[in-house]
């Protein structure tokens, strides 16, 4: 039976981490004392949902969390993996702004009442998927995935946590910019977005996508897409930004 530990202190645990070529012990007091921390925990590094959805969205929303008073966003990928696995996973996720914490012995997870058996998958003991908001070592809110078969991912996501922390905060936009090297109009579009304070992901022709992909969208770069809607090239972006500013 999973435990909702809202109102309780987090377990006192020492995590054994690896930094460079040295072992570094990290205590829960060092992570949580006097700080506001968002924690999300998951079954395992490099697993599908964790790698494609859970970690990337928290990583994307780190600036939003910090804007609303969060000191640290921790993937206590208390996924019951060791520090070597967690360090490599962090690299592949390009998630330097997240704190990846290995709970190799499952002590923190067990203390949180979230340790479950995954023997049917050959995983052994793992963390159930959940997230929590912790202030000065005390759990203020937990979002625990329902106890159903499979790997539910309904309430522990970054957007749910952000909505709890800052209900009136505007939802961040998902912006992609398709570019190519040496394109001055691409530079203009990116600069316009930066000046408007809009974060975006850049996709470079022949590195991140092909001519065939571009032709499916348009005949030239740059192309800017926002929340699934194609805005267009640099002039269209300027017009969209002006319209947005006057709204």
Curated annotation (Swiss-Prot):
One of its GO terms (cellular component) is cytoplasm. Keywords: Oxidoreductase, Peroxidase. Its EC number is 1.11.1.17. The gene is garA. GO terms for biological process: cell redox homeostasis; cellular response to oxidative stress; hydrogen peroxide catabolic process. Pfam families: Glutaredoxin, Redoxin. The keyword Oxidoreductase applies. One of its GO terms (molecular function) is thioredoxin peroxidase activity. Residues 163-247 form the Glutaredoxin domain. PANTHER family: PEROXIREDOXIN, PEROXIREDOXIN-5, MITOCHONDRIAL. Residues 4-170 form the Thioredoxin domain. SUPFAM superfamilies: Thioredoxin-like. It comes from the Bacteria. It catalyses: 2 glutathione amide + H2O2 = glutathione amide disulfide + 2 H2O. Catalyzes the oxidation of glutathione amide (GASH) to produce glutathione amide disulfide (GASSAG). May play a role in GASH metabolism under anaerobic conditions as a sulfide carrier necessary for cytoplasmic sulfide oxidation. The keyword DNA repair does not apply. This is Glutathione amide-dependent peroxidase.
């Amino acid at each position: 039976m999973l435990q909702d530990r809202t109102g309780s202190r987090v377990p006192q645990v020492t995590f054994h981490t690896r930094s460079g070529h040295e072992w570094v012990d990290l205590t829960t007091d060092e992570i949580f004392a006097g700080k506001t921390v968002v924690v999300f925990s998951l079954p395992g590094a490099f697993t599908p949902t964790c790698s494609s959805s859970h970690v990337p969205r928290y990583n994307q929303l780190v600036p939003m969390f910090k804007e609303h008073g969060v000191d640290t966003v921790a993937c206590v990928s208390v996924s019951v993996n060791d520090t070597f696995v967690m360090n490599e996973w962090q690299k592949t996720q390009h998630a330097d702004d997240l704190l990846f914490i290995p709970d190799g012995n499952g002590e923190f997870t067990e203390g949180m009442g979230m340790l479950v058996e995954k023997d049917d998958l050959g995983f052994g003991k793992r963390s159930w998927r959940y997230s929590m908001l912790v202030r000065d070592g005390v759990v203020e809110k937990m979002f625990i995935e329902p106890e159903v078969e499979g790997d539910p991912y309904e309430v522990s996501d970054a957007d749910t946590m952000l909505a709890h922390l800052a209900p009136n905060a505007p939802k961040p936009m998902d912006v992609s910019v398709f570019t190519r090297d040496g394109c001055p109009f691409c530079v203009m579009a990116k600069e316009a977005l930066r000046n408007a304070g809009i974060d975006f992901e850049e996709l470079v022709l022949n590195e991140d996508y092909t001519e065939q992909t571009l032709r499916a969208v348009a005949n030239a770069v740059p192309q800017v897409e926002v929340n699934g809607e194609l805005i267009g090239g640099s002039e269209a972006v300027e017009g969209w930004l002006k319209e947005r500013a006057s709204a």
